[in-house]
Amino acid sequence: MGGISIWQLLIIAVIVVLLFGTNKLRTLGSDLGASVKGFKKAMGDENQKETNNAEKTTNDADFDTKNLAQKTSTEEKSTTESKNKEQV
């Protein structure tokens, strides 16, 4: 009841085409598409910069990170060595 029906949208579209012409609408559409494409590219570049900055900040330390399996194996070795020393 309160919304715009399909017939009203078609009438508005016909009036817009008559006022501006198809050529002007075509150039307007291509300009709009180019601006949206440029905006998406700029946003992608911004996200790329953020990820590069995040990678740089996470790799600030001068030491190599150890694998979790390597950590557990070295901890197991140290506990067995301490048990052997206590038993002696």
Swiss-Prot record:
Membrane topology category: Single-pass membrane protein
What are the protein's UniProt keywords? Cell inner membrane, Cell membrane, Membrane, Protein transport, Translocation, Transmembrane, Transmembrane helix, Transport
One annotated GO molecular function is: protein transmembrane transporter activity
Q: Which Gene3D superfamilies match?
A: 1.20.5.3310
Q: Main localization of the protein?
A: membrane
InterPro entries in UniProt: TatA/B/E, TatA/E
Protein location: Cell inner membrane
Basic and acidic residues: bias regions: 42-65, 73-88
Q: What does this protein do?
A: Part of the twin-arginine translocation (Tat) system that transports large folded proteins containing a characteristic twin-arginine motif in their signal peptide across membranes. TatA could form the protein-conducting channel of the Tat system.
Indicate the family of this protein.
Belongs to the TatA/E family.
Provide the assembly information: The Tat system comprises two distinct complexes: a TatABC complex, containing multiple copies of TatA, TatB and TatC subunits, and a separate TatA complex, containing only TatA subunits. Substrates initially bind to the TatABC complex, which probably triggers association of the separate TatA complex to form the active translocon.
What is the protein name for this chain? Sec-independent protein translocase protein TatA
Source organism per entry reads: Proteus mirabilis (strain HI4320)
